[in-house]
Design a protein with these regions (language model features):
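Hydrophobic, well-ordered secondary-structure elements that form the walls
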Residues: 60, 85, 124
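C-terminal amphipathic helix plus adjacent low-complexity
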Residues: 95-152
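Residue-level signal for the nucleotide or nucleotide-sugar donor/cofactor binding architecture
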Residues: 55, 89, 123
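Short, contiguous hydrophobic alpha-helices characteristic of membrane insertion segments
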Residues: 67-70, 83-89, 135-148
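Nucleotide-sugar donor-binding catalytic core of glycosyltransferases
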Residues: 1-62, 66, 72-78
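Generic anion/oxyanion-binding catalytic loop in active/binding sites
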Residues: 16-19, 49, 83, 104, ...
Length: 152
């Protein structure tokens, strides 16, 4: 994410080291260097698009890194909070979760295993392609040739 100067100054005041924007393709290498990652969804996603997780949740779990997230509504029950990742309702709980992950290799392994299991079972690219094709099949048959050109 790209932040305005004012936001970067606020982060610095709180001791947060911002290393700059990274392309999605770089996420696996970045995640591989750390014990856990934190997800704080933007207000846009939590208020205007409630129930829809950001791509970060999928990326982190697919990359096999323990995830601690600020709250967001999982209205479709895509993931298993407390098993695939941990929710933190406030800064103190975030700190507790991160300390627990840091100190407990079994907790880290369990979160990684569960997160990967959920992604592999329900959220792979193949799953999304199959889902898209099911949607296309339900559309007006007259529209299917046009859609076939778009999908191809």
């Amino acid at each position: 994410m790209r932040y305005p100067r004012e936001a970067l100054a606020t982060l610095a005041r709180y001791g947060v080291r911002y290393h700059g924007w990274a392309a999605n393709a770089a996420a696996p290498a970045i995640f591989a260097r750390h014990l856990a990652t934190v997800h704080v969804p933007r207000r846009y996603y939590t208020q205007l698009l409630p129930g829809i997780p950001t791509i970060r949740v999928f990326e982190a779990l697919a990359c096999g890194i323990p995830l601690v997230s600020a709250p967001w509504e999982d209205s479709e029950h895509l993931f298993r909070p407390g098993q695939d990742f941990l929710f933190a309702r406030d800064g103190a709980e975030m700190t507790r979760h991160l300390r627990a992950i840091s100190a407990d290799p079994a907790l880290r392994a369990s979160l990684v295993q569960s997160g990967l299991e959920t992604v592999r079972a329900r959220h792979s690219c193949a799953h999304r392609a199959q889902e898209l094709m099911r949607i296309v099949e339900t559309l007006n048959p007259a529209a299917q040739p046009h859609l076939a050109r778009i999908v191809a």
